[in-house]
Amino acid sequence: MTEFLLLLIGTVLVNNFVLVQFLGLCPFMGVSGKLETAIGMSMATTFVLTLASLSSYLVEHYILLPLGIEYLRTLSFILVIAVVVQFTEMVVHKTSPTLYRLLGIFLPLITTNCAVLGVALLNINHDHNFIESVIYGFGAAVGFSLVLILFAAMRERLAVADVPAPFKGASISMITAGLMSLAFLGFTGLVKF
């Protein structure tokens, strides 16, 4: 039980996918303009990452390995992720049409989010079992969500702040992301992973 908690803390804080491993930067910069959109994207990505981790583990261990076709791993994981994203898109469209409109093109772009494929491949590389794969996927999603929501809140405050003209827009966003990354470096050594 303790190792599962350490795995979760490690993926959320110590080895954060956005700020430490630099995966998922496209939605991090693209959706973080408004807090409401960032929260919606976080929920959708959490669902997709967790379900994709679970599904990719099952595909790897019950289809690819028994048939000896491990060389199709990346292609099959992309297919699994596309199916999970389509399922998520249908669920969001039915349950929250407003959120569906707010997310717009970013919802289908979860398919191309490198963090989702990265989690699936890293699960295999780390040789996680089924439960560890789900926890790793969920932890990566929580870490992504935490960073995305914090960054969106900071960007909303920066939009109304008195920022010097040369630093407005993308410049101050990159500086803020760098400072967030430095803050997360403070968690290094918290968990040996």
Swiss-Prot record:
Main location: membrane
EC number from the UniProt entry: 7.-.-.-
InterPro entries membership: Ion_transpt_RnfA/RsxA, NqrDE/RnfAE, NqrDE/RnfAE_oxidrdctase
Keywords: Cell inner membrane, Cell membrane, Electron transport, Membrane, Translocase, Transmembrane, Transmembrane helix, Transport
GO BP: electron transport chain
One Gene Ontology CC term in the entry: plasma membrane
Entry-linked HAMAP family: RsxA_RnfA
Protein name per UniProt: Ion-translocating oxidoreductase complex subunit A
